[in-house]
């Protein structure tokens, strides 16, 4: 090539910003030859892949076990990866209630007994062992408290040095906007979460889903009828996520057997897993091992950019999406108004 080499990031007088293929190729090809894959955090199950730069969305019906599943996955993540920190942003359950789930799972003591603190001598050894295990990682877990908005998520993640953020659940969180329509709010929320991921954080998003028709034509939350279109409020949820999964009973008459349907995998294979949900001790386990193990993770980087700064950048660079009425008004303004506009319509 005879042209002068251009810098990787180009900002022209017109305001266009881009990366040239020529300048990008050398760094990318070096990375290909190095053989180091993406950073992935091992957790309780072979899939989904969770790591810096990835937004993983898990939907599910009420009482399907979304929170229990995400808590088990998050806790095992900090146990397997002693270098990472976890931030749990749960707007419906207290830290004590969430840790009760973990205590029940790790000790094998009935969750009802744990909740009511009904312990006997027969529980002593298991209780002591579980508490000792929790003590080894609890200093790397933080629980965000109200307000449940995206600014607080960013500020808390920065303050705690979180490497993984769990949002539970997205439809209940607010953004710095006057936009009160749920669909637009969720759209913007996904914009922010994608920026967080780009800053080097792993983001796990829990979402509500809507009912669908089962094979018998009934309105149901059974896994057979749920799809990417089932995520509530916004199509931006399935578009914005790297991986999208739905946790639902295989048969509504047998809620103990659930399916984690892998509906979207932007970077790799889709692996649907059937699980046994033991509600007595708040624990999920694989019914059959996954056919293919995920790739060996690379060494995780330890630093990232400020998430609060990412919010400021995104907020200053774009306005909230206009609602349908505003778009219609704008269209009429561009094409004229009054009698002529009415005749044109």
Residue spans of the language-model regions?
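The Walker A/P-loop phosphate-binding site
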Residues: 3-109, 312, 317, 339, ...
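C-terminal regions of RecA-like/P-loop NTPase motor modules
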Residues: 5-19, 29, 108, 114, ...
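Cytosolic-facing regulatory segments adjacent to core modules
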Residues: 41-46, 76-160, 175, 253, ...
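Hydrophobic/aromatic beta-strand patches that form the interior of the parallel beta-sheet core
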Residues: 56-58, 87-89, 144, 204, ...
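Helical mechanochemical/support elements of P-loop NTPase systems and associated helical scaffolds
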Residues: 69, 94-98, 123-126, 149-152, ...
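Conserved H-loop
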Residues: 93, 201, 205-208
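Flexible beta-alpha connector loops of hexameric P-loop NTPases
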Residues: 114-120, 142, 174-186, 217-229
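Helical hairpin unit composed of two closely spaced alpha helices linked by a short loop
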Residues: 163-201
């Amino acid at each position: 090539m005879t042209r002068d080499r251009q810098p990787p990031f180009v900002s022209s007088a017109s305001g266009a910003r881009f990366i040239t293929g020529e300048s990008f190729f050398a760094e990318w090809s070096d990375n290909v030859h190095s053989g180091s894959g993406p950073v992935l955090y091992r957790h309780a199950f072979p899939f989904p892949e969770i790591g810096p730069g990835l937004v993983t969305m898990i939907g599910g019906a009420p009482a399907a076990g979304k929170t229990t599943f995400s808590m088990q996955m998050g806790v095992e993540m900090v146990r397997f990866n002693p270098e990472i920190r976890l931030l749990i942003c749960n707007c419906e359950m207290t830290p004590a209630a969430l840790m009760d789930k973990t205590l029940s799972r790790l000790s094998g003591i009935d969750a009802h007994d744990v909740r009511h603190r009904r312990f006997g001598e027969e529980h002593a050894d298991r209780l002591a062992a579980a508490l000792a295990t929790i003590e080894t990682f609890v200093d790397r877990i933080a629980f965000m408290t109200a307000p449940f908005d995206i600014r607080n998520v960013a500020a808390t993640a920065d303050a705690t040095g979180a490497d993984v953020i769990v949002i539970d659940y997205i439809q209940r969180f607010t953004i710095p906007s006057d936009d009160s329509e749920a669909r637009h709010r969720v759209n913007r929320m996904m914009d922010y979460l994608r920026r967080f991921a780009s800053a080097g954080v792993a983001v796990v998003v829990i979402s509500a889903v809507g009912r669908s028709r089962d094979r018998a034509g009934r309105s149901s939350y059974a896994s057979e009828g749920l799809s990417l279109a089932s995520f509530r409020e916004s199509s931006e949820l399935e578009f914005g996520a790297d991986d999208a999964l739905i946790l639902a009973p295989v048969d509504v008459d047998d809620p103990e057997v659930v399916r984690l349907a892998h509906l979207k995998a932007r970077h790799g294979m889709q692996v649907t897993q059937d699980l046994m949900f033991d509600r007595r001790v708040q624990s999920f386990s694989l019914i059959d091992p996954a056919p293919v193990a995920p790739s060996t993770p690379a060494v995780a980087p330890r630093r990232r950019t400020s998430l609060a700064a990412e919010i400021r950048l995104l907020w200053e660079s774009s306005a909230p999406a206009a609602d349908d009425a505003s778009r219609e008004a704008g269209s009429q303004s561009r094409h004229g108004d009054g009698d002529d506009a009415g005749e044109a319509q």
